[in-house]
């Protein structure tokens, strides 16, 4: 049995909301004046929002809130109750998941200063921890960001970033030369970045920290055909990766947001053996292989080439034809939109768990697109670049559902 905490997220949210109300009486004490919550997401409602237990896939959902003040990874049940917590030595950079051997594999954000420090997707360390949060080993890498995974051979595969050679950078199409936009994605560009371009490389690293394989985007992508697809994106970042996935044959699925590209890389030759790009996807995240051989993708949609309205959707792609064979999108389409991050997981019962990352919302849909479970992350924190208290965020890189048997096994082995 899993020890459940003696409080619910709903009760905590209610108590926190009541504690924050500033009340005063007027007109002889007959009128009650209360302060209105100024954080939009808190005001809309948090915690469990909907649940049909007979239609939702039974199990537990793991997630790590993405802000610097919290290093916890949470596991909740279908009722939104926290049933287990891992406390990590680093804030998330950006997520964690349970391994086949029952442990927690975690991407963390280190405090060391580097050119990645001004980006919210900075990483710096991956580690493996047991069920109680004890760190078994960790690997640091100054270029690591977004996502890393534990390979079947026991090594780790990391998304890393480095400067693109000048002769290649000059040929990359798209993007804005000057980018002074203030947003949650980029801190103000320091003068040192002027004229520079960074792009991704994959690094396979042993648990002892030895790099045994690398794959550099600028050596394989076409600067013209695979240019920066996002209209307002800075030229500072070319092929910035956000997800990596090991296929059964050892080949690698990787996703690159600024180029709106998903590729499959041959581990034997290093060649790109499959590619999906715009207009099918726009700023996508999290491609995974399904049992039927298709690929599931969270398609963010901030700069669509075939629609003037930004919206997100989840699509299932037949890689033999690159055709969409299933999709989920809201009605109207703009009701569901995460401009950054996002994830989709196909569940054993055929449903799909979707992470609308920017708003900390996880929801499960049937094949027909009906919502059978919905939860909004109630853990808020200040974003990495500060701001007033009302700017607190509850964003989550990805949420993952595990069966009751998987959690029991993880507790036993991990």
Give the role of each language-model region.
Residues 18-19, 25-414:
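Histidine-/acidic-rich catalytic cores in large beta-rich domains
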